[in-house]
Amino acid sequence: MTSGESKTGLKNVYPSAKKLLPKVEEGEAEDYCTPGAFELERLFWKGSPQYTHVNEVWPKLYIGDETTALDRYGLQKAGFTHVLNAAHGRWNVDTGPDYYRDMAIEYHGVEADDLPSFDLSVFFYPAAAFIDAALRYDHNKILVHCVMGRSRSATLVLAYLMIHRNMTLVDAIQQVAKNRCVLPNRGFLKQLRELDRQLVQQRRQAQQGEDAEKCEQEP
């Protein structure tokens, strides 16, 4: 094993960040409507890459599994500075700040169960804020993980892209799914759909306010 590799094979799963950025569209369609759960699931299935331990889904933002999170050597070699554990707790991935205490890693834990009945939405904004704070500095790199890196962690990353990157749920799913095989459970999808509706409504209201202000300023 070379110095650039880890026992989980992290070396070969860090693509160039430039390849991850989505194509920029001219504005958001005024008639956009949040799709149903089945339509969203089809987006996940379409073109999803083969499952691996960890993938970069946005520049400096990675989704991974328990194996990745427990590999302290691999995390250090890869240069991770932040870890968001979406399966924090004794009966899930029991790491916590002490697990990384002798490493330059900032930890944030979310105690969540991968069940459709679990309300993960209460963690959307705190988790998104943690990710956003980490990505404000170019030298930082954050791992968001759960057990498999498919449902809980993916849901929180999707929420981040929607809240802080102004993406619709469809845009966020397409961004993540082209880089990693993920599939949030139906309950989490329902919560993301509700977040999508709220954010789209807020943006439309903000745009209407800007348009009204422009009209008032015209002679």
From Swiss-Prot:
It comes from the Eukaryota. CDD domains: DUPD1. Its EC number is 3.1.3.16, 3.1.3.48. Dual specificity phosphatase able to dephosphorylate phosphotyrosine, phosphoserine and phosphothreonine residues within the same substrate, with a preference for phosphotyrosine as a substrate. Involved in the modulation of intracellular signaling cascades. May regulate glucose metabolism by activating, AMPK, an energy sensor protein kinase. Affects MAP kinase signaling though modulation of the ERK1/2 cascade in skeletal muscle promoting muscle cell differentiation, development and atrophy. One of its GO terms (cellular component) is cytoplasm. The active site is at residue 146. GO terms for molecular function: MAP kinase phosphatase activity; protein homodimerization activity; protein serine/threonine phosphatase activity; protein tyrosine phosphatase activity; protein tyrosine/serine/threonine phosphatase activity. This is Dual specificity phosphatase 29. It catalyses: O-phospho-L-tyrosyl-[protein] + H2O = L-tyrosyl-[protein] + phosphate; O-phospho-L-seryl-[protein] + H2O = L-seryl-[protein] + phosphate; O-phospho-L-threonyl-[protein] + H2O = L-threonyl-[protein] + phosphate. It is an enzyme of class 3 (hydrolase). Homodimer. Interacts with PRKAA2. Substrate binds at residues 145-152. It is found in: Cytoplasm; Nucleus. Residues 53-201 form the Tyrosine-protein phosphatase domain. GO terms for biological process: glucose homeostasis; muscle cell differentiation; negative regulation of ERK1 and ERK2 cascade; negative regulation of MAPK cascade; protein dephosphorylation. Keywords: Cytoplasm, Hydrolase, Nucleus, Protein phosphatase. Belongs to the protein-tyrosine phosphatase family. Non-receptor class dual specificity subfamily. The keyword Flavoprotein does not apply.
